[in-house]
Structures are given as structure tokens and as C-alpha cells.
Amino acid sequence: MNKTNHFKRQALIASVLLAAPLVSHSAIVPDRTRVIFNGNENSITVTLKNGNATLPYLAQAWLEDDKFAKDTRYFTALPPLQRIEPKSDGQVKVQPLPAAASLPQDRESLFYFNVREIPPKSDKPNTLQLALQTRIKFFYRPVAVARQVDKTHPWQTKLTLTYQGDGVIFDNPTPFYLVISNAGSKENETASDFKNLLIA
């Protein structure tokens, strides 16, 4: 993608991960921290787990674009709403729509897969109920890009860091997205105010 990203000099050593760990106290959670949809797939299934031992929940699923706006142009999530019993699983099938063929074929495209849990109505008065939502990254990976995944020559080795002034330029010449989840100094001091960076 040949884009560069700047961050402060304290971020000299980066732990590069493809996705940040999912931290959630929701009852309904997906079975993964990211979704990669390969261009040669007809569908992909995400399992939703209800961790509550006593209550059933409704689970609503949809996709958003990279600006967090609901997007129904390229993919559909079915069923959009389902009931999941206590300590049980549900499944959401994500399928491409015809417009998915118009997505860039030389690089990944970023979307977000969302799940909102809807608790059963409480029979207790004056009870505040929250509909918690989990959002994970959803990457569309075209066939031509998927062919570049080589475990013997990882694409991550092509990433470079270059000092410039009081900062660092992070160059990602690959067609893949990546997340930098942590950074620190040469003395292995983790930057306390470091925020995840998503780099195209």
C-alpha cells in the first residue's frame, strides 16, 4: 500500500500483531478477534457464544465500513438477529454481495463486524439494562493478495522503521493491514500512553 505513518520517538520497538486482543465483558462474544474473508470464499461463519449461564440473549449482527458507518453494499450477515440460549452458541454467516467484486483486488479492504447483545426484559422494577456491542476487524483479502501469504517469507519482514526528527516513520509497502498494539524504548519500557495503530 506504500503508505507511511508517524509516531513519537518513544515508540522504537513495536510489537506488531495482526489484531488486538478482544477485551469484553459481554455475554455474547464472537469466537475470534478478527475476520479474514478470502476472495475465493462463498461465505464465512462466525460463531457467537453466550457465556451467561442462566439468561438467553438476542444477538444482532451487521457490518460497517472503515468509518464505522453501517455498510450493506458488499457483504450481508445472516441471520441479522437471533436468539442464543444460555451457555449455547449461535452462528452468523457472512456472504459477499455482487458489489464485492468491485472492491480493490490489489490490497485488503477494511470493514468491521459488529455484534450487539440484547438482554431479556427484567421482571424487576427500576432495572437498568445495557445492550453491549462488540466490534472486530473484518478484512476482505482478494485472491491475488492471499497468494502472497508465505509462511517461509513472512510479509511482516518487509516493514521498515525510519527515524525522522523526533519521530519515526513506519512504512508498510505490503497490501496487508497490520496493527501495532504496543511500543517501548530500547530499555524495554512500554509506552504508557501508546494507542493501537492500524496501518494500511
Positions of PLM-derived features:
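Bacterial N-terminal signal peptides that target proteins for export
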Residues: N2-L12
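N-terminal signal peptide c-region/cleavage motif recognized by signal peptidases
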Residues: A19-S24
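Beta-sheet-dominated interaction scaffolds and their linkers
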Residues: S26-K49, Q148-Y163
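Asparagine-centered strand-capping/turn motif at beta-strand->loop junctions
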Residues: L48-N52, V168-T174
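Short acidic, flexible loop segments centered on an aromatic residue
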Residues: A53-A69, T174-T190
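Solvent-exposed coil/turn segments that connect beta secondary-structure elements
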Residues: E64-D66, D89, Q95-A99, R116-I118, ...
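Intrinsically disordered, low-complexity Pro/Gly/Ser/Thr-rich segments with frequent PxxP/GP/PP motifs
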Residues: T72-A101, E189-A200
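Terminal connector regions
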Residues: A99-V145
